[in-house]
Every structure is written in C-alpha cells, then in structure tokens.
C-alpha cells in the first residue's frame, strides 16, 4: 500500500484526478442561485440610487422655488445673498 503511494514521487502528471463533488454538474436549483443573488443585489442598489436621486431632486426643487403659504403675494422674495448684494454701500 505504501509502495503504491510513493510510486509517483516526482512529476504528478501521471495521476488521474477525479472530479470532486463541487465540480460535478449542478442541479437546476443551484444553477440559478448565484444569478438570483446578483440580480437581487443589482435591483436593491438601483432602488437605493433612485431614492437618493429623487430625494436630491426634490431638495433642489425646493431650493430653486420654495413653497410659500401666501401664493397671492406679489412681492418678490430674495435670499440672504441676494439681499446683501442689493444693500447700497456708502
């Protein structure tokens, strides 16, 4: 038994390597499990990015045109930066 084990002590190309259980043909349920995982990960990241995009767009919309309770008021409203530039300096 030990003689057969030490027979190929040099180059190992003569040995026959049989496939293990991990390299055998997958079943139909295991074949698509990685695909489902990657598709689910992609869709969840896409949903998070879309939520962030819409949140940023809504914030930008409120910065550009803020919501006023008195919409009939015709007096133009300015931000602090615009008001400081309109103040005359002596």
From Swiss-Prot:
Broad class of the protein's primary localization: membrane
Pfam families per UniProt: SRTM1
Keyword tags: Glycoprotein, Membrane, Transmembrane, Transmembrane helix
Keyword field contains Transmembrane helix: yes
Entry's transmembrane regions: 38-58
Membrane topology, from the record: Single-pass membrane protein
GO CC entries: intracellular membrane-bounded organelle; membrane
Subcellular location: Membrane
Glycosylation sites: 11
Coiled coil stretches, renumbered: none
InterPro entries reported for this sequence: SERTM
Region span, Disordered: 69-90
Protein name: Serine-rich and transmembrane domain-containing 2
Lineage: Eukaryota, Metazoa, Chordata, Craniata, Vertebrata
Gene responsible for this protein: SERTM2
């Amino acid at each position: 038994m030990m003689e057969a084990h030490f027979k190929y002590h040099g180059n190992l190309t003569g040995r026959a390597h049989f496939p293990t259980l991990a390299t055998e043909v997958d079943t139909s349920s295991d074949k698509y499990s990685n695909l489902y995982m990657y598709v689910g990960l992609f869709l969840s990241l896409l949903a998070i990015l879309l939520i962030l995009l819409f949140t940023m767009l809504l914030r930008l919309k409120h910065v550009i045109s803020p919501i006023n309770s008195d919409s009939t008021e015709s007096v133009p409203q300015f931000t602090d930066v615009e008001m400081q530039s309109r103040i005359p300096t002596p």
